Amino acid sequence: MVRHVGASVVGSNSANFAGKFNNGSVDLAYAPAVAYTPLELYKGVQPNGAVVKYALGYMNFQVIIHRDRFPDDAGQMVRDQAIKRIDEAYEIIAEAEAGIPDDVIQLLPGAGETVGARLVSNPRIGGVAFTGSNETAGAIHKALAERGGAIVPLIAETGGINAMIVDSTALPEQAVQAIVESAFQSAGQRCSALRCLYVQEDIVEGFTEMLTGAMDALVMGTPWHLSTDVGPVIDEDARSTIAAHIQQARAEGRLMHELKTPNSGSFIAPTLIRVTGIADLEREIFGPVLHLATFKSDELDAVIDAINATGYGLTFGLQTRIDDRVQHVTDRIEAGNMYVNRNQIGAIVGSQPFGGEGLSGTGPKAGGPHYLPRYTLATAPQQGTDWSGAMKQADIEKALKEANTGRDKRLNDLVLPGPTGESNRLGSYRRNAILCLGPGADTAKAQAEAVRALGGAAVEATGDVAPDLLTTLDGHAGALWWGDTEKGRAYAQALAARTGPILPLITGQPDHGHVCHERHVCVDTTAAGGNAALLGGAA
């Protein structure tokens, strides 16, 4: 029986002291989130071993990053590996988690390249939950594929180049508040923070004046003062990297507005930089730097295409008072968490399960209904017989093209609880097809049936598939293999050698997160004329 653990510790070394109270409310939200998954569904399942929680958390979310990983709720031992800057926050967790035996959570502080690498390469580890950069996530994926022992799951949340669109119907005061909160709160050191703002050109002049005025009202200083709005970035290395980006924009004449930087400390002043579009951002700038682009009214779909083309898909914001536009944009944007007429940070798990897609993460969403099963052991049936021949690459590509018809189709829509005046919906969208590699036709058929039963798309192999094809084949979301460990390791290594999103080798039964993206849409219903559901209920 899956074991449910009690409340989380509240405590967060925020980029400003006032933010502690806000972040603490998020910490609390993570604690009961597992309750949204009926635990009776997991009677008889087993934990899949000790799990490494490998969190490269920047100063605002150390406790939350811990609490959004629930292997301990699935009866597993947990080893926390924290970066050296945030050891104290993890000590709070290791010492004070309510009701957890001493040997269940173990804190191993130290640098990722030493402690973390040793943990990930250990064959006794049953899974890894990681928050950090794409580069490090890729390195972990390769290490897991190359080590001895069973193939184990990796859940990665890897940030993004997050955008917001403001059209000419948006309420300017509301939009500016949402932008300032999204871009500059916690000194921009949230994976969900706003990086690229698109403003309709009809309103850009007056809107920019209002935005820069709001920036001028921000107070920079020590995080311990309640009056502080923006504190320092995490360290001097981060400060110098961000400062170099700002200096390049200044040299190119694209610096639109910048606050005065304090004389001491690792501060970066909130900064506004002009860009032609999101494609100008080659990487995420993890700090209080906002990039502004404009668009014409008939270019909305082109803007959406540009945002999707980055390959990232974590958070997205929209400011508009046109309901049809809300529907159109949220139907087309490929992002895990979308926010309408509010800021795009501070997801409340249980109402807003959090996590991205593509380059922004593997899924399933933290705090969502499909998260806990990933930490359980879903044993595959007895392995099938070996293939007698090989499947050609051309045949695989043809089958993938046919199977991916209807990709991104919404399979279901779940209404989640939330405060009055806010709508929260979680939708499931079909991923690219899963390759069902057998071995053997009967096994491949059983794999495909398991995928389709979850709403996913599948391609059944008709012969042996060479491992190196998994490195170059496009149009799939991973592979199922219920055969020998040696061949499975070759498949895992081929998938880990890919560039782009992390794709899994599944050696047990597939789960919902393997076959579907989860996309959440949060709407401030008061911004478009009031809460119709509330008014209707009162009548």
Predicted feature locations:
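Short acidic capping loops at alpha-helix termini that bridge into adjacent secondary structure
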Residues: 102-105, 433
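Short amphipathic alpha-helical coupling segments at ligand-binding clamshell hinges
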Residues: 70-89, 93, 203-210, 302, ...
